[in-house]
Amino acid sequence: MEYRVTEILTFAEPDLLNERQSWLATLAGERRLADNTVEAYERDTRQFLRFLTGYIGRPAAIRDIADLRPVDLRAFLANRRKEGAGARSLGRHLAGLRSLLHHLQKKGLVNAAGATAMRAPKQPKSLPKPLTDRQALKITTAEAQLNEEPWIAARNAAVLSLLYGCGLRISEALGLTPADFPPGTRSLRITGKGNKTRIVPLLAVVTEAVDTYRKLCPYALAADEPMFLGARGGKLQPAIIQREMQKLRGAFGLPENATPHALRHSFATHLLAGGGDLRTIQELLGHASLSTTQVYTGVDTARLLEIYDNAHPRA
């Protein structure tokens, strides 16, 4: 992905703009971060530079970044908190700024030791919000897709089936190529966060959904290029699937938590409820730490308590 940033030209000097552009290109290229992550870091650092310009009273330059102290970063985070940013967003802001500072330090332009030592805001533990199995099954069929051309309906159903049937992140699903689906394959090799590779089983119903899309797609699908295409033949963007889910929420009366990522949560929660063990689910999701996967035990317990409260005569 290439980033051409023009919006902040009025509140950052060219030396800083050029280095920021180089940093973003490194994130997208060499480090292979997901598009969504790079876009978030671009937005976060843009907000920071706008804040810094107001803070120092002139367009920010590299020399100003070199002079940053933890108190300056705390002032920025406090400003963002006043604007309504939550702990998770503040943590991402700080992670992006640290990454930019490390980039500048590697080039010998700043000494980032002081600023990067600042601790991230404490993150509240929140439970994932899965759909019910009935809701998940309903929205992963081509028939559920609304007022779409047949090939687009098949495409949406295939993508959503991969999220729920394989537990993929949306960026992982949209990065798949026809070469990932050789004839007769029963599994997918997925490269996820941190370039960690995992193998996930491929359910027959998911294979069928993908095959239907490939047959109906009006564009030629190159073996090593992204398989899921937009209406004009370019790579399908996550925002399209997110908008589709928004339409499905309205059409089927689904809760606000019915998002593409909720299908991945549903995959894990339903496996756990069906007797799957945490270690296996950890591998299927590509979590580096078991503690990340253990949050789903809380989801399952919460669902059990909800059923108990609604059904038990003494509740």
UniProtKB/Swiss-Prot annotation:
Pfam families xrefs: Phage_int_SAM_1, Phage_integrase
A molecular function (GO) term: DNA binding
Any one annotated GO CC term: cytoplasm
InterPro entries: CB, DNA_brk_join_enz, Integrase-like_cat_sf, Integrase_catalytic, Integrase_recombinase_N, Integrase_SAM-like_N, Tyrosine_recombinase_XerC/XerD, Tyrosine_recombinase_XerCD
Annotated Tyr recombinase domain residues: 126-309
GO biological process, one term: chromosome segregation
Core-binding (CB) domain segment(s): 14-105
Keywords: Cell cycle, Cell division, Chromosome partition, Cytoplasm, DNA integration, DNA recombination, DNA-binding
Coiled coil: none
Active site: 169, 193, 261, 264, 287, 296
Function text: Site-specific tyrosine recombinase, which acts by catalyzing the cutting and rejoining of the recombining DNA molecules. The XerC-XerD complex is essential to convert dimers of the bacterial chromosome into monomers to permit their segregation at cell division. It also contributes to the segregational stability of plasmids.
Recorded family membership: Belongs to the 'phage' integrase family. XerC subfamily.
Quaternary context: Forms a cyclic heterotetrameric complex composed of two molecules of XerC and two molecules of XerD.
Protein name per Swiss-Prot or TrEMBL: Tyrosine recombinase XerC
Name of the gene this protein is made from: xerC
